[in-house]
Amino acid sequence: MNKIDELTPKKVVEKLDNYIIGQKEAKKQVAIALRNRIRRLSLSEDVRKDVIPKNILMIGSTGVGKTEIARRLAEVANAPFVKVEATRFTEVGYVGKNVESMVRELVDSSVNMVKKEMMEEVKDKAQRLVEERIVEVLVPSKKRAKAQPSFMDVMQLFNQNAEYSQNKDYDENEDENIRRRREELLEKLRNGELEDVEIEVEVEEQSSPMFAGLGPELEDMGIQFGEMFQNLMPKKKKRRRMKISEARKVLEPIESEKLIDQDKLIQEGVSRAENSGIIFIDEIDKITSKGVSSGPDVSREGVQRDLLPIVEGTTVMTKYGSISTDYILFIAAGAFSEAKPSDLIPELQGRFPIRAELSDLTKEDFIRILTQPKNAILKQYQYLLQTDGVKIEFTEDGVERMADIAFELNEKVENIGARRLYTVVEKVLEEVSFEAPASGEWELKIDSNYVDLRLGKVYGDEDLREYIL
């Protein structure tokens, strides 16, 4: 059983619990959807082709965890993931990006993911090649100019046999000296003794996109053609002077890429995008037509109709070849505060059979969000300030007070969910963050009194809190 087979729905939910508080139903549904994809891969070919993923529609107000659930799911499954906003697309024929661009982005993400894995596999070999290349720069071999023989050279051929053995001995001695010198420097290089030595290396010059500034759709096409032309043209190279420590970072990706099988990379990247890819479509409620059939709503419905074949399953042309969207998992999300899921066109509703409703966060949820997740908000600030020698301790009543203020602000001003916590915590720690670098090492206890001291004036003034918190 390999690593992906071990991802049972329960284990997926457990992993999601490390990052996301609450929303048990939504976690359960995405975990089942992921497991069904794993089950599908175990089926025979004739059955597998008929089993398509059941797409998910998440319904919940902003800041309750919709995006985070989808993003962490892709992370757990090590699957290619791309997030797009439905509002950025326009109907075919209008100025703007068309819906096929999301599939191209997914394939790019997938290929880059596979490339990163392959580069990690050849990392040791690439590092050795980089060291050899650096040593060759430090101790270059003798360059022998090969000019056309002159008349005098031809006349001297009679004496060449007599001189050949002497020249050969000289060349061999010189090559031996170069080899010995390189071995000495290689040992020093591996011991880190030469990191600050400056050398001159030859690197490929980065060229600007050929079709930039043409508008979203034409630019998308232009990038495909631009990369194709750049691959046909010889690469421009330039010489740069840098320290060996920097040269390692510049040369390692170049050497790693030479060791990678590009055909295998593209094949695996495309396959992973088609069979494991996840596309998260946010703000899908913003393209509902609400029963109106004129004005800007015509374009909104047009976007829905353009989305339909992508979600149903079609073939999209990309720079890596044709990509089938039949088995890509689509997760759509929206607050649906001013519209209902039933306002989507019926055909699109039918393509998102699983509905996951996310509940609004409570004060207790806020307390848990501040403290419980892996690298929770308060832990992040503690780590950041610790780098400047400041040790922060949050008391229980201090955490409760921040959660209480964030919850009340969501109730009275605008409900932005857990994002409100960042605003509150940032304001509480504003003075500390400003003073920390110049104050040396010190400790600070943040309790409810300190929170009120930092937020009292802003929180008490209705006009100020609307603009600042």
From Swiss-Prot:
- Supply the alphabetized keyword list: ATP-binding, Chaperone, Cytoplasm, Nucleotide-binding, Stress response
What is its subcellular localisation?
A: Cytoplasm
Q: Which Gene Ontology molecular-function terms are recorded?
A: ATP binding; ATP hydrolysis activity; peptidase activity; proteasome-activating activity
Q: Which Pfam families match?
A: AAA, AAA_2
Residues bound to ATP are: 21, 63-68, 282, 347, 419
Biological processes, Gene Ontology terms:
protein unfolding; proteolysis involved in protein catabolic process
Name a GO CC annotation attached to this entry.
Answer: HslUV protease complex
Superkingdom of origin: Bacteria
Q: Which InterPro entries match?
A: AAA+_ATPase (IPR003593), ATP-dep_Clp_protease_ClpX (IPR050052), ATPase_AAA_core (IPR003959), Clp_ATPase_C (IPR019489), HslU (IPR004491), P-loop_NTPase (IPR027417)
> Which HAMAP family does UniProt cross-reference here?
HslU
What family is this? Answer: Belongs to the ClpX chaperone family. HslU subfamily.
Assembly = A double ring-shaped homohexamer of HslV is capped on each side by a ring-shaped HslU homohexamer. The assembly of the HslU/HslV complex is dependent on binding of ATP.
The record describes the protein's role as: ATPase subunit of a proteasome-like degradation complex; this subunit has chaperone activity. The binding of ATP and its subsequent hydrolysis by HslU are essential for unfolding of protein substrates subsequently hydrolyzed by HslV. HslU recognizes the N-terminal part of its protein substrates and unfolds these before they are guided to HslV for hydrolysis.
Its name, as the record gives it, is ATP-dependent protease ATPase subunit HslU
Classification from the root reads: Bacteria, Thermotogati, Thermotogota, Thermotogae, Petrotogales
Which gene is this protein's source? Answer: hslU
